[in-house]
Amino acid sequence: MASGGSGGVSVPALWSEVNRYGQNGDFTRALKTVNKILQINKDDVTALHCKVVCLIQNGSFKEALNVINTHTKVLANNSLSFEKAYCEYRLNRIENALKTIESANQQTDKLKELYGQVLYRLERYDECLAVYRDLVRNSQDDYDEERKTNLSAVVAAQSNWEKVVPENLGLQEGTHELCYNAACALIGQGQLSQAMKILQKAEDLCRRSLSEDSDGTEEDPQAELAIIHGQMAYILQLQGRTEEALQLYNQIIKLKPTDVGLLAVIANNIITINKDQNVFDSKKKVKLTNAEGVEFKLSKKQLQAIEFNKALLAMYTNQAEQCRKISASLQSQSPEHLLPVLIQAAQLCREKQHTKAIELLQEFSDQHPENAAEIKLTMAQLKISQGNISKACLILRSIEELKHKPGMVSALVTMYSHEEDIDSAIEVFTQAIQWYQNHQPKSSAHLSLIREAANFKLKYGRKKEAISDLEQLWKQNPKDIHTLAQLISAYSLVDPEKAKALSKHLPSSDSMSLKVDVEALENSPGATYIRKKGGKVAGDSQPKEQGQGDLKKKKKKKKGKLPKNYDPKVTPDPERWLPMRERSYYRGRKKGKKKDQIGKGTQGATAGASSELDASKTVSSPPTSPRPGSAATASASTSNIIPPRHQKPAGAPATKKKQQQKKKKGGKGGW
């Protein structure tokens, strides 16, 4: 073996060492030996190539790229396009990697593999799908399973981010990775129950494969399963089972997986569950979305969703400037996106600046007419919250693509009815019916609108206007007796002769299968429980004077106990129910008898109160003109001294005891 200082070792011997170290996977020692060869011949192309490979194997991508860029002239004939592109890819210089691959002299299989990865990172899924299809079709080696996994990942990405219906590529779900990607594709199509079943299958396959792998550590199964469990929790969240989803999310976070992308997505989903509640927990979780390298692990739409939720969290926590800063940044990145401007408008509304919010929305609507419908709906909602119903109706009627929809017609008619603008409500009906007449005549929505318009006009006494609608409905269905009856009723006030003529179309009672026995109906006694609604007749209670019910009442009525000193010969005082001060014979107290009647007066008189009223105590007594609330409300004011956590109900014994003690202190006249 050549030592570091032995300069006499031959180059072939050094190459033998490099070969041996490479076969053993000891690329650190192989790199040292290659450097010795380069000291002998610094322009040795093979040695430079080996050095780049050793650096890549050791994860030193920057240093490997520097070697390639430094020796560009020497390596011109021996192209290292793959190594250079791979270093750029691992350093997240994706655009540079794409240029390197496209400028390569020869497109080898390994370059195509890398090309597919680069296209996937750039989210150019259609091109990526074509590359992987070609690789799966034309490659025959031990990496076929990995290529199929990558192919299924592209299909899942298209389904989720581009809402493309995935085509059946005939991929067998033989591994947990393939099952996981298939489930992701189903989630993008909204097939949540089926996706959950496939994820459960992926979990079983993952546990089985990891148990068979003797080289894996105990942390490997948990790391692999965390991704599957995270997707299961997401399905539970979409199904509205937020408690189960939250529990599963927190279990994954406790495992502390090393995948920063997974942690960021889970933290973001927890924040969406918390919304404006539990913001302290959301503030802790949002730190996970700021981890280093997250931007390279997630797609653009995932990163955008995280930023949206950061802006909303800032709004919920009253960080107005932070909210505006994030939403403005999002708007600059995606000027046509709705959410940033909606968040800004919501923040302005929280600050009671509704007018500015409406102006902001109107400006966005003018700049992006393709999104005007959603913006105008929000503007109308703000106008309604301000109580300006008429203006809200005008905004809603300006949405051309929605003004004929039954839901919009219903909302407009309701608001116009609230404003008592019946003419405008009828105009809304007329315009909607005319649209369906031109585009979808005789459709269910068309006939439903005509019927609702007729009912509305009849409700507000517009019988003449309702006649044309009812006639149109009756012509569509001459057997509709209900519509015919409405039409006859309307004509009876406008044209009695026409009403009489139409009444001939009504079926006779014999032809109607009502199955009513007229004689039985006339002979029936009628309602038998009418008396329940009113009071009982006096005579009804007489037969029950000695019945069982009366005995029960006698048992309930117990005679009250008489006082011990009760004298039946003495007539009770007729004014005994009045307070003493309001009785006719009350003359007030005589002077000089206060001390003798302590404890004999009305409730609430104490020694403290009597001492405060004693004018003989001039030195230690409080001022004769008490401050408001210091005399009659003395007990109430002192109770406020007790801290909130020690407060007890006013009727509690401890409170009364404390009040009495304080009143006794007051009797001494001290401050």
Curated annotation (Swiss-Prot):
GO biological process, one term: SRP-dependent cotranslational protein targeting to membrane
UniProt region (Required for the interaction with the SRP68/7SL RNA complex), positions on chain: 379-509
Phosphothreonine found at: 571, 618
Main location: cytoplasm
Bias-annotated ranges (Basic and acidic residues): 564-585
Keywords: Acetylation, Cytoplasm, Endoplasmic reticulum, Isopeptide bond, Phosphoprotein, Repeat, Ribonucleoprotein, Signal recognition particle, TPR repeat, Ubl conjugation
Annotated InterPro entries: Signal_recog_part_SRP72_RNA-bd, SRP72, SRP72_TPR-like, TPR-like_helical_dom_sf, TPR_rpt
Positions of the UniProt region annotated as Required for interaction with SRP68: 9-163
The keyword Glycosyltransferase is assigned to this record: no
One CC-aspect GO term: signal recognition particle, endoplasmic reticulum targeting
Region of interest (RNA-binding), residue spans: 545-617
Modified residues (Phosphoserine): 630, 635
Recorded family membership: Belongs to the SRP72 family.
UniProt name for this protein: Signal recognition particle subunit SRP72
Underlying gene: SRP72
